Amino acid sequence: MQSCIGRGTILIVEDEQLMLRLVEKVLLQHGYQVLVASDGEAAIEVYRRHKLEIDVVLLDVGLPKLTGWDVLLKMKEEKSDVRVVIATGFLEPKMKTEMSRVAVKHFVDKPYMLDEVVETLQSLIDAPVASSGSNTPVT
């Protein structure tokens, strides 16, 4: 894995505990601040408490209690310019189109390629916010 120094705070939302702990460990080793949630309701609770600190959310689609889609919409209500990377083993084209419509531009496949996850998260943290008033990153 390529070495880089991470900056920023990342919320990982993942219901598979082994995957959650692995990604958390890798991100911590890269220097990121990491928050975690293992279901949709916990994700919303953590996000509401820390939304001003969180730079990017790594969001699994298949979650218990609330789906990743529901979590995404609630996060957008809290902070319209939330930056999200969707993680999924399979995403139907219609759902991907809907997520893209609400400004999700980054998707990573599961099982994770950890280098890809780190690079994608850092590129989103580094991306400037559009000045057109849309509050979405320029990507």
Language-model features, listed with the residues they occupy:
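The feature encodes the CheY-like receiver
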Residues: 20, 64, 92
